[in-house]
């Protein structure tokens, strides 16, 4: 086992010719080489490792460039370069070696060597030799190594859980390197590669020890695609038995590391308890690592966005205290409205009710109804309203419009094809009202869309601690005490092809049809997993794994199993009131050996069969 090599050994192994012998016994402990370039024009970073610790390479291209210099310039550039502390300079095949290199090599006692290969081959051979010669190995007995989504995942800790989850991960299509007897080798400057140290009884077969001490032939059971000889290590998963008093990372900002062969590997501590699907959590950890390598720091993004929302909410509270008002800007942004007049008033105008009107009677001069309404809502104009105005005498229609525009209307919205006359624009402009154009031709479509949006905003709401998911088209709320496994169960359901609406805090409201609709708070699609921290479901699993809102059809409460009551009848006729509407509820008891996600799917399918008349 090597921790260093020497120039002499490199010369012998790579069959290099010695042009000038300096100190051939210089120790090399860095597996890097450097092909000179900037140095040829006199740019010398005299403090760099490249020019003081790495073996340097000069190819035919660089040597030809040097040969074009004047004698004075050669002297200056080469003398300064050769005075630095790099251990050796290797010229490749056919390189032009000027006399100045020989002169200053002798003066500074430098090793000058010649390769009989071209630059690309020389570089490749030296790198390969150094990576092998300088590798450091250590054996780790109770560690397992797998490749999951291309990520090298090292696992330690709770032995029985580790062996069980490895089988499930292999069944899911991932690859095993070793279940124990792991050797970790450091290659390059900071890369770690793991492989199995134990000799196998059958050549090319991989074995996994089960919890009873027997062995499973992974190669026979799952094929050669389920194994690989070695893998670069990226993350460490430590499995721990669940401890109620222990604090497990719930945000993911504080990155932990563990040292192996002098290098640090990022570590996740995953608590193991009944109902948690470890395979899905470990897969998610691997995907999260890849996401971070791509520059996405999900916990930091979550924290930054949360702070922005807190500041915005604080400012909104200071602006209009506890009044339930909707800024006009939100409606404009939601429906992509084009502002025609009144842009200067948009930021200071609020909508106080869900009322959306077409003016009709007001246009013929009947204003009794509009005067009785406490909060005048948004007014919609289409081609029909303007055709009606054209049938009125000119003086009457102008007077009616003037009277109409004296009321406190938050916003007037035109259909995209309304084509208003000039007098209408003049009157609205003088009145100071906000005039916008919607991207719809039918006024009824605008009224319906605005009503749905405004009703959801102004309706009574409630927030529930749980996870809202969509299964088979049904909106299902998972509830239960903290730590029971709601988020982990939802994570496996997402992995099975279902969709997330909201995690942790779900906001419910009644829509115009009377249905209870659930949606996320201000930050949708984030999920909190103990041990991993905050993960971004939309980024990890794609847009098909999420949706913004969903009607609530069923509640499933996760409970720890009560061993004294294990023969109890199922909870088939429970209901829970949400905003005045009874919602079907089932109890799911969590215990070892029960797959919570699969049980949730069965409960939803059972609910579906009941709706179809099956008993």
UniProtKB/Swiss-Prot annotation:
Catalytic reaction annotation: [HPr protein]-L-serine + ATP = [HPr protein]-O-phospho-L-serine + ADP + H(+); [HPr protein]-O-phospho-L-serine + phosphate + H(+) = [HPr protein]-L-serine + diphosphate
Keywords: ATP-binding, Kinase, Multifunctional enzyme, Nucleotide-binding, Repeat, Serine/threonine-protein kinase, Transferase
InterPro entries with a match to the protein in the record: HPr(Ser)_kin/Pase (IPR003755), Hpr_kin/Pase_C (IPR011104), Hpr_kin/Pase_Hpr_N (IPR011126), P-loop_NTPase (IPR027417), Ser_kin/Pase_Hpr-like_N_sf (IPR028979)
Residues that coordinate or bind ATP: 480-487
EC number: 2.7.11.-, 2.7.4.-
An example Gene Ontology CC term for this record: cytosol
Pfam families, per the entry: Hpr_kinase_C, Hpr_kinase_N
Keyword ATP-binding: yes
UniProt cross-references to SUPFAM superfamilies, sorted A to Z: HprK N-terminal domain-like, PEP carboxykinase-like
Enzyme class: transferase
Molecular function via GO: ATP binding; phosphorelay sensor kinase activity; protein serine/threonine kinase activity
GO BP annotations listed: regulation of carbohydrate metabolic process
Reported function: Catalyzes the ATP- as well as the pyrophosphate-dependent phosphorylation of a specific serine residue in HPr, a phosphocarrier protein of the phosphoenolpyruvate-dependent sugar phosphotransferase system (PTS). HprK/P also catalyzes the pyrophosphate-producing, inorganic phosphate-dependent dephosphorylation (phosphorolysis) of seryl-phosphorylated HPr (P-Ser-HPr).
Other comment: This protein is composed of two complete HPrK/P domains fused in tandem. This unusual organization may lead to a separation of the two antagonistic activities in F.nucleatum, with the C-terminal copy carrying the kinase and the N-terminal copy carrying the phosphorylase.
Family: Belongs to the HPrK/P family.
Protein name: Putative HPr kinase/phosphorylase
Organism of provenance: Fusobacterium nucleatum subsp. nucleatum (strain ATCC 25586 / DSM 15643 / BCRC 10681 / CIP 101130 / JCM 8532 / KCTC 2640 / LMG 13131 / VPI 4355)
Gene expressing this chain: hprK
């Amino acid at each position: 086992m090597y921790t260093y090599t020497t120039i002499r050994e490199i010369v012998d192994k790579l069959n290099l010719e010695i042009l000038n012998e300096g100190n051939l016994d210089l120790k090399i402990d860095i597996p890097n080489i450097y092909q000179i370039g900037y140095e040829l024009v006199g740019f010398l970073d005299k403090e760099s490792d490249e020019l003081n610790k790495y073996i340097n390479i000069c190819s035919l291209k660089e040597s030809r460039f040097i040969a074009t210099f004047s004698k004075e310039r050669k002297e200056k550039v080469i003398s300064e370069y050769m005075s630095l502390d790099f251990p050796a300079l290797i010229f490749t095949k056919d390189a032009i070696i000027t006399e100045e290199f020989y002169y200053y090599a002798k003066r500074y006692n430098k090793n000058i060597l010649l390769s009989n290969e071209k630059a690309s081959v020389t570089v490749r051979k030296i790198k390969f030799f150094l990576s092998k010669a300088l590798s450091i190995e250590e054996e780790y007995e109770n560690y397992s190594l797998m490749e999951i989504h291309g990520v090298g995942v090292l696992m330690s800790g709770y032995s029985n859980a580790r062996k069980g989850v490895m089988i499930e991960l292999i069944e899911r299509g991932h690859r095993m390197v070793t279940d124990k007897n792991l050797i970790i080798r450091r290659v390059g400057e900071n890369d770690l590669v793991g492989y199995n140290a134990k000799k196998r009884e059958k050549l090319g077969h991989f074995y996994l020890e089960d919890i009873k001490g027997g062995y499973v032939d992974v190669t026979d059971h799952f094929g050669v695609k389920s194994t690989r000889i070695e893998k670069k290590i990226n993350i460490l998963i430590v499995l721990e038995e669940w401890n109620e008093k222990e604090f497990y990372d719930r945000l993911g900002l504080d990155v932990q590391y563990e040292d192996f062969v002098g290098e640090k590997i990022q570590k996740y501590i995953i608590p193991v308890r009944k109902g948690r699907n470890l395979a899905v959590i470990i897969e998610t950890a691997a995907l999260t690592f890849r996401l971070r390598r791509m520059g996405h720091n999900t916990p930091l993004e979550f924290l930054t966005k949360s702070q922005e929302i807190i500041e915005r909410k604080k400012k909104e509270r200071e602006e209009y205290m506890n009044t339930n008002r909707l800024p006009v800007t939100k409606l404009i942004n939601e429906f992509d409205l084009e502002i025609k007049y009144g842009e200067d008033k948009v930021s200071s105008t609020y909508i106080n009710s869900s009322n959306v009107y077409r003016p009709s009677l007001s246009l013929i001069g009947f204003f009794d109804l509009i005067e009785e309404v406490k909060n005048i809502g948004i007014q919609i104009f289409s081609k029909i309203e303007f055709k009606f105005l054209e049938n009125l005498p000119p003086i009457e229609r102008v007077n009616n419009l003037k009277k109409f525009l004296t009321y406190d209307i938050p916003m007037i919205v035109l259909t995209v094809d309304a084509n208003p006359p000039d007098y209408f624009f003049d009157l609205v402009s003088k009145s100071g009202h906000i005039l916008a154009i919607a991207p719809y031709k039918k006024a009824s479509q605008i009224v319906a869309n605005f009503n749905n949006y405004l009703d959801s905003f102004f309706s009574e709401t409630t927030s529930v601690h749980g996870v809202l998911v969509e299964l088979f088209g049904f909106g299902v709320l998972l509830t239960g005490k903290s730590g029971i496994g709601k988020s982990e169960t939802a994570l496996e359901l997402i992995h099975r092809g279902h969709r997330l609406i909201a995690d942790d805090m779900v906001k419910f409201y009644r829509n115009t049809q009377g249905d209870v609709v659930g949606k996320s708070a201000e930050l949708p699609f984030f999920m909190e997993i103990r041990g991993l921290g905050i993960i971004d479901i939309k980024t990890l699993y794609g847009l098909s794994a999420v949706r913004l809102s969903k009607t609530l059809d069923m509640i499933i409460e996760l409970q720890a199993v009560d061993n004294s009551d294990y023969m109890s009848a199922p909870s088939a006729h429970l209901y829970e009131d949400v905003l005045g509407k009874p919602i079907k509820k089932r109890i799911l008891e969590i215990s070892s050996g029960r797959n919570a996600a699969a049980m949730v799917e069965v409960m939803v399918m059972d609910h579906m069969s009941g709706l179809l008349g099956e008993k």
